[in-house]
Regions:
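Charged catalytic cores and adjacent phosphate/nucleic-acid-binding surfaces used
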Residues: 1-25, 36-37, 59, 83-98, ...
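Structural recognition of the beta-strand scaffold that forms the well-ordered cores
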Residues: 47, 77, 119, 139-141, ...
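Divalent metal-binding pocket/active-site signature
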Residues: 28, 54, 97-105, 109-131
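Surface-exposed amphipathic alpha-helices with a cationic face
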Residues: 61-68, 105-119, 156-163
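Short acidic, glycine/proline-enriched helix-loop-strand junctions
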Residues: 56-76
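Active-site flanking residues adjacent to catalytic metal/cofactor-binding acidic residues
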Residues: 7, 49, 79, 121, ...
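Divalent metal-dependent hydrolysis catalytic cores, especially in the metallo-beta-lactamase
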Residues: 27, 33-55, 117
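Short, well-ordered coil/turn segments that N-cap beta-strands
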Residues: 1-3, 42-45, 69-75, 114-116, ...
Length: 192
């Protein structure tokens, strides 16, 4: 059964520090607004990938469960983890926070221990990118709607093809208007 899924988005619980002396700020999208837009776009699933926290996922799931209007939107746990080099890794299906500041290898190991799946977001963006380290992830984000240069997504696609990796797209939504900009059609199989 195919589902339309948003694989890379943030809400007001995202915890990204610009500098050590700065308070965390990443986006101001509310839980209600995130679900409302997902509903209006006809999304079947949303993976909340807040920076360095699972907060926002739990609150989104609770709000969804309290409002019948959103009952058909599946909400899944995920996190965007900042490695020791500043590069990011997306972790899907985890249930415990993976602390920032770990090496890429440590992050990947922890994702696997939790039974999750890893993805390299914006692997060839101008700043804080995994580049060749993306090979260690399960998937590669070949299209990130926030990449400002035209070559980053093309390089990510070429990299994924050369390394025979699963390709996904991400809205990387930090504002409400970009939620659902990149939707992945996933095939879900139910085991009896």
């Amino acid at each position: 059964m195919p589902i339309n899924a948003e694989l890379h988005c943030h809400n007001s619980f995202s915890n990204f520090h610009v500098g050590d002396d700065e308070p965390p700020y990443d986006c101001d999208v509310s839980i209600r607004d995130q679900l409302e837009r997902s509903h209006n776009l006809g999304l079947d699933a949303i993976f909340v990938t807040n920076h360095n926290t699972l907060d926002g996922y739990r609150q989104l799931l609770e709000y969804k469960n309290d409002h019948a209007k959103f009952k058909n939107i599946n909400v899944f746990p995920a996190e965007e983890i900042t490695t020791d080099t500043g590069a990011h890794v997306l972790a899907y299906g985890i249930h415990d926070v993976i602390s920032p500041g770990l090496s890429l290898e440590e992050v990947i190991d922890e994702v696997k221990k939790q039974g999750g799946v890893s993805s390299a977001p914006h692997p060839f963006s101008l700043l804080d990118a995994l580049r060749g380290g993306a090979k260690k992830c399960d998937m590669v984000e070949v299209f990130n709607s926030n990449n400002v240069d035209i070559l980053s997504n093309a390089r990510a696609t070429e990299f994924a093809l050369d390394n025979n990796m699963i390709q996904v797209a991400g809205s990387d939504s930090h504002v409400l208007s970009t939620l659902g900009r990149c939707v992945n059609v996933l095939m879900i199989f139910y085991l009896l």
